[in-house]
Amino acid sequence: MIYLHAIDPIAFSLGPVKVHWYGLMYLAGFGAAWCLGRQRIQAGRLLGVNIDGFSDLLFYAMMGVVLGGRVGYMLFYAFHDFLQEPLLLFRVWEGGMSFHGGLIGVLLAVAWWSRRQRMHMFDVVDFCAPLVPVGLGFGRLGNFIGGELWGKLTHNGWGVIFPRAPLSDVPAGQLAMQDVMNFVQIQEHYAAGLLGHYARHPSQLYEAFLEGLVMFIVLWLFSRKLRPRYAVSGLFALLYGVFRFLVEFVRMPDNGVYVAFGWLTRGQILSLPLIVIGLFLFWLSCRSPVLQPVPAPEVAK
């Protein structure tokens, strides 16, 4: 059944401060990472690090996600706007985060933390990789609740009508449904069955399922058995790259513009290196040691 998106992106207000569901999804993702990471720490899966040390790591990873995600969005998707108005970088409440930028930010944070602790960076990345998909899933749910990053038009029965989406897939920048009708009129037309041809793929939910649920199950089960260094990180990069590349075929390109060939999106271009890196890390893992778990120490590193 076709669904009309009518979810308020604002969860609640505290005086003049409006708390968005998207921000709450970030908090849920970090909370889940904390709980799952705590379990792995207690199992001795990050050598020489206890709960306090993991808390320190998670704090820097959170900073990397937020800062890297915002900077990445400006560089990858809104560079022209950033050049015109550099202060856009700090207006995070207006939205705009990039997974690929967040990934770079996390890797830089992990590299710094690992060096400070005199640990191999990829031992830490392998530990963290199974914790990430839950956060990705929550983030994509936040995108859906916010009615953003929608998919292309579809005739499938599970399509979603997004009032903020353009009335057509092309050309970019045209009027959205909410620009020509108020929400009461949209609801009346929806009830009369007149809006079915404006339904779109809920690509946010596709990504929540693949990048969130499926990746979590696969990585969690894969990492339960001791694996050589680089293997878990390689599987994460490979799965995300493949899933994101595939979903981009039914997701509207950023700003409605394809980068090449009339179908290749910026998200696909940014995901291709992840596939290559994933395969390379798998190759490296065949030549690397398998680290045995060691109970967490009493004192954090």
From Swiss-Prot:
Keywords: Cell inner membrane, Cell membrane, Membrane, Transferase, Transmembrane, Transmembrane helix. One of its GO terms (molecular function) is phosphatidylglycerol-prolipoprotein diacylglyceryl transferase activity. The chain crosses the membrane at residues 10-30, 57-77, 92-112, 119-139, 202-222, 230-250, 264-284. It is a multi-pass membrane protein. Pathway: Protein modification; lipoprotein biosynthesis (diacylglyceryl transfer). PROSITE patterns: LGT. It is found in: Cell inner membrane. It is an enzyme of class 2 (transferase). One of its GO terms (cellular component) is plasma membrane. InterPro entries: Lgt. A 1,2-diacyl-sn-glycero-3-phospho-(1'-sn-glycerol) binds at residue 140. One of its GO terms (biological process) is lipoprotein biosynthetic process. Its EC number is 2.5.1.145. Catalyzes the transfer of the diacylglyceryl group from phosphatidylglycerol to the sulfhydryl group of the N-terminal cysteine of a prolipoprotein, the first step in the formation of mature lipoproteins. Belongs to the Lgt family. NCBIfam families: lgt (TIGR00544). This is Phosphatidylglycerol--prolipoprotein diacylglyceryl transferase. It comes from Xylella fastidiosa (strain M12).
